[in-house]
Amino acid sequence: MLENYRNLVFLGIAAFKPDLIIFLEQGKEPWNMKRHEMVEEPPVICSHFSQEFWPEQGIEDSFQKMILRRYDKCGHENLHLKISCTNVDECNVHKEGYNKLNQSLTTTQSKVFQCGKYANVFHKCSNSNRHKIRHTGEKGLKCKEYVRSFCMLSHLSQHERIYTRENSYKCEENGKAFNWSSTLTYYKSIHTGEKPYKCEECGKAFSKFSILTKHKVIHTGEKPYKCEECGKAFNRSSILTKHKIIHTGEKPYKCEECGKGFSSVSTLNTHKAIHAEEKPYKCEECGKASNSSSKLMEHKRIHTGEKPYKCEECGKAFSWSSSLTEHKRIHAGEKPYKCEECGKAFNRSSILTKHKIIHTGEKPYKCEGCGKAFSKVSTLNTHKAIHAEEKPYKCEECGKASNSSSKLMEHKRIHTGEKPYKCEECGKAFSWSSSLTEHKRIHAGEKPYKCEECGKAFTWSSSFTKHKRIHAAEKPYKCEECGKGFSTFSILTKHKIIHTGEKRYKCEECGKAFSWSSILTEHKIIHTGEKPYKCEECGKAFSRSSSLTRHKRIHTGEKPYKCEECGKAFKSSSTVSYHKKIHTGENP
């Protein structure tokens, strides 16, 4: 019986209880039961010595005898006595015996040691345990210190190290100890610079398998993390978490100094340097100092002209990654920044901030010289130059001076005729970005400037400003020649031509000359017969925009021109002028 028992153990077939009792009764060294007392299944055989598996039912004696004969050739009788060994170094007897047995067994015979549920052949006891637990879902191993259960002994051992602080894995380089061998292996790679995990796609190596896994997503293009708010997908959960802040507006990172909140820890760290006033990173080219090395590197690209961030869609390159990210939204049509007031969306947070000022009417930028306030810092800077009377930027073409280089560049387009800003909707091009922005409102039907007096809305701020003067009867622009006042400077300029008699705008078709370019444009329509201005209400067309504007008042009933004498209102300025003669006694 004992001999049979030894043979079964050697083959990796766990003994049943009666055999175990007989073995103990014969006075042999007992098994180390401590390791197995929590497991309901038969005890574990050394993973380095044999393949631990329950025996298949109905194995013929002849086959078992054949294996036993091969066992006899290995020539080691006491292999079964070291059943509870956990380390291959402790188990040299097993290791030697296992190698001989492995050479003796054929592939067919090895298949005896299989999982009873699926025909998977395992090479280690630990693997077979994991495999069987997947079928049962059993968690039989309990921690004595904490009320926690584990499927496998290895998991329990790892858990126990946390509270016992058993740092059994020591670094030979500096003596630092770790709970797990995997942590030690990773730590060692810091000293050696070893990167054992290589990407098969591009050859790039990494120190951690988890980093390699993350890297592989670049090649597969897989984006498993999806935003429920806008549907945008990402290849990392951390990027999705950062993205979500756009929708929530959350700023969880707060400055202890001033209480200001930020959406990312990196932005907070950059901000903190403002309080510390530390700027240790200096540009050798221009002397500009920065509070971070990364900011200095970005700044240097201004001097070098380097543009490392390229758009795969159109090939356009950028100096900064943030600029590329913003640019990509043009192709994607993505506009994550939404105005809560009117619902309009933008692809940049800075544009949304500027847009909000339309609704609030806020003018946070004040001139120290005269107290005048502005909605933009750029407009304030331009204004300041009026007080300083500094105009260092001169046009070589016409001699006109400007207080900013950007204004001079814009002015030069008058001479060159350059129109770099094109409308994607209709193809119309403009010399200035502001003109394109205003033009786009025509397609969108947007009229953000609303008159509080009469409720009329306007597409452009300039039109709104002019309109307000109708209610205020304000005419700040006065003619020095005749004293007549006007609501806009452009109308005053046109008026002055009456006194000079100048007619510099000539029609090429008939030779007729005009004082104003707008009148020439309207005159040309006589020759073409074109009527581009159409009433949406009744379909009637006009050759002049002013005629269409006057016509629309028939439908709206609007009477913006008021008589100051009697309060009567009229649809056109000419009608109110005619009416005023009744009060003055002039012949109408």
Swiss-Prot record:
Keywords recorded for this protein, A-Z: DNA-binding, Metal-binding, Nucleus, Repeat, Transcription, Transcription regulation, Zinc, Zinc-finger
Gene Ontology CC annotation, any one: nucleus
A biological-process GO annotation: regulation of DNA-templated transcription
Disulfide cross-links: none
Main localization is nucleus
SUPFAM superfamilies in the record: beta-beta-alpha zinc fingers
- Residues forming the KRAB domain are 1-43
Q: Which InterPro entries match?
A: KRAB (IPR001909), Znf_C2H2-type (IPR050758), Znf_C2H2_sf (IPR036236), Znf_C2H2_type (IPR013087)
Function per UniProt: May be involved in transcriptional regulation.
Question: What is this protein's record name?
Answer: Zinc finger protein 676
Gene source species: Homo sapiens (Human)
Species lineage, top-down? Eukaryota, Metazoa, Chordata, Craniata, Vertebrata
